[in-house]
């Protein structure tokens, strides 16, 4: 059985002042948090990132303007934050494969180009289809393979 002297009971008179102002509560909480963050009275083991932190009284953070801010100075892990490159007409399916679609201006519909194991392969399919549309459009205008019409006329005169 536990020693009843070590277990506080609810009927004991606890020294606490319920009539604190908000400012007084704020000062107490900030002081407690500063002690926890600065590890006052705790173990002496330190992590490598603790050396990069500014002291608590360093003034406002240059990024967020909060006094004593530690969130903005933590090193960012680029491997975790690494974003996937976005390609036009390419999206990732729930299965993990990459799908490519393109708008066909002549039919006024989306044309399905297929699914691919990588985003780069899907982007290549999109680029090939886009080049085909450009070639088709320029052929309608009387040019071949995207050549400028004015260039063709000047070469015929020579």
Swiss-Prot record:
The keyword Cell membrane does not apply. Residues 134-158 are annotated as: Disordered. One of its GO terms (cellular component) is nucleus. One of its GO terms (biological process) is ethylene-activated signaling pathway. This is Ethylene-responsive transcription factor ERF120. SMART domains: AP2 (SM00380). It holds the Pfam family AP2. The gene is ERF120. It is found in: Nucleus. Gene3D superfamilies: AP2/ERF domain (3.30.730.10). CDD domains: AP2 (cd00018). Keywords: Activator, DNA-binding, Ethylene signaling pathway, Nucleus, Transcription, Transcription regulation. GO terms for molecular function: DNA binding; DNA-binding transcription factor activity.
């Amino acid at each position: 059985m536990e020693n009843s002297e070590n277990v506080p009971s609810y009927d004991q008179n606890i020294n606490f002042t319920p009539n604190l102002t908000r400012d007084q509560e704020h000062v107490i909480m900030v002081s407690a948090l500063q002690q926890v963050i600065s590890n006052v009275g705790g173990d002496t083991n330190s992590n490598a990132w603790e050396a990069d932190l500014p002291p608590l009284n360093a003034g406002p953070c240059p990024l967020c303007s909060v006094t004593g801010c530690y969130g903005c100075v933590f090193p960012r892990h680029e491997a975790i934050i690494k974003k996937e490159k976005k390609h036009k007409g390419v999206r990732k399916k729930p299965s993990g494969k990459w799908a490519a679609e393109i708008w066909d201006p002549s039919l006024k519909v989306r044309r399905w180009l297929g699914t691919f194991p990588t985003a780069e392969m899907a982007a290549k399919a999109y680029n090939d289809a886009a080049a085909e549309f450009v070639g088709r459009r320029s052929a309608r205008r009387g040019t071949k393979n995207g050549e400028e019409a004015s260039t063709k006329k000047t070469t015929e005169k020579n």
